[in-house]
A protein has these predicted regions:
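RNase H-like nuclease fold core
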Residues: 15-17, 29-136, 148-152, 241
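Short, surface-exposed amphipathic charged segments that create phosphate/polyanion-binding patches used
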Residues: 236-244
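RNase H catalytic domain
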Residues: 5, 13-19, 32, 101, ...
């Protein structure tokens, strides 16, 4: 579904809260990706569908802000305009790892990557009370990322447009295409069976709604499906947790 007026109002509130003029205006990430019903999927980020990023090579799209110690998107206005770092964005890479996946000895971990040497980078093992699987690891990586993102954006009102990059197509599809339908159907999937990990994903979906629509929200969080080769930072963190 598209952005609601409530989400737009909260985003405008964040913009008006900025006291320091910016050299570059924010580029609002318009949703040009649609589902089979012609509805825009506002939590899905596809650079090729974004006019502010479609002409920027993938290798140049994300840059590290050494002052803020986090990753941000590059942007480019229409025409022969220079590329500049979009100060209103935040890019976070997440990944999960599981050794012995599908066995009683399985052990899973997560990694959250904000950039090279960033103090916000995080990793850890999944609690033993949580199912040890690759899918659970990806979901818990998202949970860890959202906690840090919320804290960062609360302390820095410039950070409004959040991109969560992951190589897990399951997670991207679940959180952008399916979760609202699953909620409407009480957690039952298209095959008439309970969706695995539904309760945890519903909890994170509600957190995303709170970050977007609540009085202190105004953040627009989108999921970005990336190739594994672009997710090496988060992957390394997840595996480091297993090696420790």
């Amino acid at each position: 579904m598209g952005l609601t007026s409530a989400a737009t109002d909260q985003t405008i509130h964040r913009v008006l809260s900025l006291l320091v003029p910016q050299q570059q205006p924010p580029i609002i990430p318009m949703a040009f990706t649609y589902n089979e019903y012609g509805e825009d999927i506002h939590r899905l980020f596809v650079p090729a569908d974004d006019p502010g990023r479609s002409r920027i090579p993938s290798t140049d799209l994300v840059v590290y802000n050494t002052d803020k110690q986090l990753l941000q998107l590059q942007s480019q206005a229409a025409g022969p305009s220079p590329v500049y770092r979009d100060e209103f964005t935040l890019v976070v890479y997440i990944d999960g790892a599981c050794r012995g996946n599908g066995t009683p000895q399985a052990r899973a971990s997560y990694g959250v990557y904000f950039g090279p040497g960033s103090p916000y980078n995080a990793n850890g093992l999944l609690p033993t009370t949580v199912r040890q699987s690759s899918t659970c690891a990806e979901i818990e990586a998202l949970a860890a990322a959202l906690n840090t993102i919320h804290e960062l954006c609360t302390n820095d009102l410039k950070l409004m447009f959040i991109k969560i990059a992951t190589d897990s197509k399951f997670l991207v599809d679940a959180m952008t295409l399916h979760i609202e339908g699953w909620i409407e159907d009480g957690g039952i999937g298209s095959r008439g069976k309970k969706v695995i990990h539904y309760e945890r994903m519903k909890e994170l979906h509600e957190l995303l709604d709170d970050m977007e629509y609540s009085d202190d929200g105004g953040m627009i969080v989108q999921f970005w499906h990336v190739d594994r080769s672009l997710n090496e930072g988060a992957d390394a963190l997840a595996n480091a947790a297993l090696d420790a």
